[in-house]
């Protein structure tokens, strides 16, 4: 960031100080512009950037940043000139031109390489001028004329020294030492005059002057006339000019001449030949040797020095005075009275005739050494409020009328023309005029608070403001000897550096809480919201000091502005006019700001280092266009990559998402700082706060569409344009629309697969469930069947048991019957009678009917036995089968015998035979075998 230095002169001794109000001076040191000390030529391109031919090459300044471009051979740049935005430079054995590339950086094209090396050898270019399509490069022995259309050279040589070349209108003039003044006609040199002035003295500049010329020489002063009729320029400054060793000279836009000298700084001479300013190192320049002079488009005058660069704003409405030696001190109050300017400082009261002249001298009013607080004229008498008391100043002499410590202010009392109320460190006091002279009368008892700010509500009622204790309303007795009532005004918020002042018969109170107006009816302070909003809008509170102006205006001081509150022309509503003069430039005495308006709009502002004057109505704010200077991108922790500015839209990889933007406005007057606002659409839509920082960096931007916007403000003038740059950060390949479509398709496919898998799974599950259900049903069915079977078996078992019981009963019946019949038969046999009965008995014993009935029952109970038996033993006889049936019923031989109508022994024999037929082993039981079948 450039360093601004604002300097003024102070030479003298205690009690008398030379006063010279100087224009603002801005100094740039070699360490700031990163070059060497000497600066040989200066120019300005169409884009308003300033360029310097420096020992290290070409310097570029855009109002914010310095950039250095070395010449290809590392030579000193002696000359620079701009045509549009093309810069032509020249140095030792080298000249060519520079043009900005797409990155807004200058690229060099050498023209001297088109020449025969012998033509340029040992030549050093000192000046470059343009004429139609030709560019003329002047060295000390040659002029190289370059045709930009045909790209060809023509060379004019000089036997002797060729110091300068000039363009007057469409004519080209140049000087050859020992030969005279020449003119180019159709590309040929023509001698204009061989006057001794041109043969023997170096011509620094040739300037048109109505129908003749001004000839500025290095060491013979200035002449006027035609080339053939020359005479000295006879003006008031001629004698001074004739003593100067002039190295550079330029005419400014107002017609004045600026002469750069060796060892004596710079002189500004009016068109009439009057000395306007003389600036040298003690006035603030960095060096007294001025190598080059240039007036830019905003009328700032640049000085290329033997050591550094200075910029002087001769046309500024501001003039500065700075007390470097500390003799004058900090200015707390000022006033013009009876043709004299008085300055009250921390070191005394000083005076000088007014208006100020270049040779004005400040003198100390004897006896006023120390802190002066206030200067005020009451009834044409000048009162001086001093740390030592109160003085009346007459004819530059001080007369003490009160020796009480610390007089802040004095005010007239309505209805009492011979009384003045005085505020002191310890309350209020009364001054009285007796026999035409003012004197101290009494202290007003009952109030001992320091009374720096006080205003009358009525002749005996007033308000007193103290920044730490608040605002008090005091009621005085009619004799002004004591305070009868003290009321603390709670409606007035306390605040640092707060103060009250009267404006158009109304009392105003200014604090960091806002601007308040006192209502005499309700005895309340009411905030003026409209004025408070205007005062504090994008501004910072600095001090509540309010100063009465010339036209009943009221001056206030904020962090960034001096504000004038004045009545509206068409209504009674107060209007605010702001002058963007920052506190850092003003060098305010915060809380003790003082501004004296000696004429409407003409102001003198006291500062901590002296004072400044300005014409408020002449302070204008030129709008400047803002430009994006450079754009760089980078990856995380990667190197910066310059971005072309001529690209309407550019896309970046998602990993290249860090961006740095640099911007500027070509405003070089540091009186009003350049501030910037930016926003990045696509990230956020609101503007940033105003800031002097001219670079912004964005890191880790997400993929998206962005537009960077920046605007500037110089003073109160916002740039008419908004510079912009549009760019896109591409999404990573895996987040592109194609990939997103692929992901959607893949997701749909996956969903479809999942759906299908689910359907298959569902079907399988359903089938499994169905199978399990079927199995369960089958099991249930089996269980039911088993139950039914069990029931059926139980029924069958019951039936079998029933049949068995029936069979057993039948068997037993048959057995009993046969036994009975056998008994009967035996009885009959033993009696020998009854053959017929025997026959009946035998028929009943061998009754087939009984057997068939028995067999039917047996088959119902044991259906398969006979089948198995016959299958295993097919050779069994019916009697054998009958025996097997009886054995199946587990009947003994004894029980079987009656059934077969044979003896028990016969049964045993049958059993034996049956065993043999069945091929049973000896140890195998016949009954068990039959039961197991």
Label the model's feature ranges.
Residues 1-730, 736-737, 742-755:
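Carboxylate-rich, polar loop motifs that coordinate divalent cations or form catalytic acidic clusters
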Residues 179, 792-799, 827-836:
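Short, compositionally biased low-complexity segments
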Residues 319-323, 739, 752-822:
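Cytosolic signal-transmission helices at domain junctions
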Residues 332-333, 798, 867:
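PAS-family sensory domains
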Residues 614, 634, 757, 817, ...:
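Phosphate/oxyanion-binding loops and surfaces in catalytic or ligand/nucleic-acid-binding neighborhoods
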Residues 647-649, 664-730, 821-822, 829, ...:
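Cytosolic nucleotide-binding catalytic cores of signal-transduction proteins
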């Amino acid at each position: 960031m450039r360093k601004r230095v604002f300097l003024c002169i102070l030479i003298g001794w205690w009690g008398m100080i030379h006063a010279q109000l100087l224009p603002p001076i801005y100094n740039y040191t070699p360490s700031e512009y990163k070059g060497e000390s000497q600066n040989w030529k200066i120019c300005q391109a169409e884009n308003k950037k300033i360029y310097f031919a420096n020992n290290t090459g070409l310097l570029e300044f855009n109002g914010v940043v310095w950039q250095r471009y070395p010449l290809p051979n590392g030579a000193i740049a002696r000359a620079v000139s701009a045509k549009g935005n093309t810069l032509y430079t020249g140095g030792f054995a080298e000249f060519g031109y520079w043009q900005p590339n797409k990155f807004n950086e200058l690229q060099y094209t050498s023209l001297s390489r088109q020449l025969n090396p012998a033509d340029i050898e040992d030549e050093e270019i000192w000046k470059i001028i343009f004429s139609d399509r030709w560019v003329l490069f002047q060295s000390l022995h040659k002029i190289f004329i370059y045709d930009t259309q045909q790209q060809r050279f023509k060379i004019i040589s000089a036997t002797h020294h060729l110091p300068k070349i000039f363009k007057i209108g469409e004519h080209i003039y140049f000087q050859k030492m020992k030969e005279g003044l020449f003119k180019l006609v159709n590309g040929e040199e023509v001698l204009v005059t061989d006057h001794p002035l041109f043969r023997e003295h170096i011509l620094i500049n040739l300037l048109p002057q109505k129908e003749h010329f001004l000839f500025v020489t290095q060491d013979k002063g200035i002449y006027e006339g035609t080339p053939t009729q020359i005479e000295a320029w006879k003006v008031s400054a001629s004698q001074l000019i004739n003593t100067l060793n002039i190295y550079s000279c330029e005419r400014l836009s107002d017609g004045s001449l600026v002469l750069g000298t060796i060892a004596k700084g710079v002189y500004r001479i009016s068109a009439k030949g009057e000395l306007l300013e003389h600036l040298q190192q003690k006035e603030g320049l960095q060096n007294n040797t001025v190598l080059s002079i240039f007036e830019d488009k905003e009328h700032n005058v640049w000085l290329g020095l033997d050591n550094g660069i200075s910029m002087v704003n001769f046309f500024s409405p501001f003039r500065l005075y700075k007390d470097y030696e500390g003799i004058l001190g900090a200015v707390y109050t000022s006033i013009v009275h009876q043709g004299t300017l008085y300055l009250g400082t921390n070191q005394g009261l000083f005076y000088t005739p007014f208006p100020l002249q270049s040779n004005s001298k400040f003198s100390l009013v004897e006896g006023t050494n120390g802190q002066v607080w206030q200067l005020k004229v009451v009834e044409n008498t000048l009162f001086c409020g001093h740390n030592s008391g109160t003085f009346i100043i007459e004819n530059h002499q001080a007369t003490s009328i009160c020796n009480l410590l610390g007089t802040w202010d004095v005010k007239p009392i309505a209805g009492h023309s011979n009384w003045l109320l005085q505020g002191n460190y310890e309350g209020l006091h009364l001054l009285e005029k007796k026999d035409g002279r003012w004197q101290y009368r009494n202290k007003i008892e009952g109030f001992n608070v320091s009374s720096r700010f006080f205003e009358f509500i009525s002749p005996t009622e007033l308000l007193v403001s103290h920044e730490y204790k608040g605002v008090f309303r005091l009621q005085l007795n009619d004799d002004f000897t004591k305070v009868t009532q003290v009321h603390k005004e709670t409606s007035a918020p306390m605040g640092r550096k707060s103060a009250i002042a009267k404006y158009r018969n109304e009392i105003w109170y200014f604090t960091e809480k806002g601007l308040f107006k006192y209502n005499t009816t309700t005895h309340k302070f009411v905030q003026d919201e409209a004025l408070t909003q205007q005062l504090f809008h994008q501004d910072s509170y600095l001090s509540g000091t309010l100063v009465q102006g010339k036209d009943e205006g009221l001056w206030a001081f904020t962090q960034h502005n001096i504000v004038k509150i004045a009545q509206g022309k068409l209504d009674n509503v107060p209007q605010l006019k702001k002058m963007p003069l920052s506190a850092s430039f003003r060098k305010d005495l915060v809380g003790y700001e003082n501004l004296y308006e000696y004429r409407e709009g003409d102001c003198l502002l006291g500062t901590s280092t002296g004072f400044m004057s300005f014409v408020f109505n002449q302070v204008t704010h030129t709008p400047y266009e803002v430009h994006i200077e450079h754009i760089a991108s980078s990856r995380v922790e990667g190197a910066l990559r310059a971005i072309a500015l001529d690209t309407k839209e550019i896309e970046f990889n998602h990993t290249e998402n860090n961006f740095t933007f640099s911007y500027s406005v070509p405003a070089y007057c540091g009186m009003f700082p350049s501030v910037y606002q930016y926003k990045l659409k696509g990230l956020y839509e609101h503007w940033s706060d105003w800031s002097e920082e001219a670079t912004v960096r964005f890191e880790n931007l997400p993929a998206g569409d962005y537009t960077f916007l920046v605007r500037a403000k110089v003073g109160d003038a916002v740039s008419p344009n908004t510079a912009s740059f549009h760019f896109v950060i591409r999404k990573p390949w895996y987040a592109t629309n194609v990939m997103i479509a692929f992901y959607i398709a893949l997701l749909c496919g996956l969903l479809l697969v999942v759906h299908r898998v689910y359907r298959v799974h569902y079907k399988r599950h359903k089938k499994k469930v169905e199978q399990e259900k079927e199995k369960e049903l089958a099991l249930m069915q089996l269980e039911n069947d088993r139950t039914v079977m069990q029931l059926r078996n139980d029924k069958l078992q019951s039936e079998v048991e029933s049949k068995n019981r029936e069979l057993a009963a039948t068997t037993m019946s048959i057995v009993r019957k046969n036994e009975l019949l056998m008994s009967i038969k035996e009885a009959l046999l033993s009696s020998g009678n009854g053959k017929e009965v025997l026959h009946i008995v035998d028929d009943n014993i061998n009754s087939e009917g009984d057997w068939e009935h028995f067999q039917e029952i047996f088959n119902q109970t044991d259906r398969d036995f006979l089948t198995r038996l016959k299958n295993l033993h097919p050779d069994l006889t019916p009697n054998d089968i009958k025996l097997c049936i009886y054995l199946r019923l587990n009947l003994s031989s004894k029980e079987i015998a009656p059934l077969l109508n044979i003896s028990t022994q016969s049964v045993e024999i049958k059993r034996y035979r049956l065993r043999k037929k069945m091929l049973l082993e000896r140890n195998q039981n016949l009954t068990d075998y039959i039961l197991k079948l």
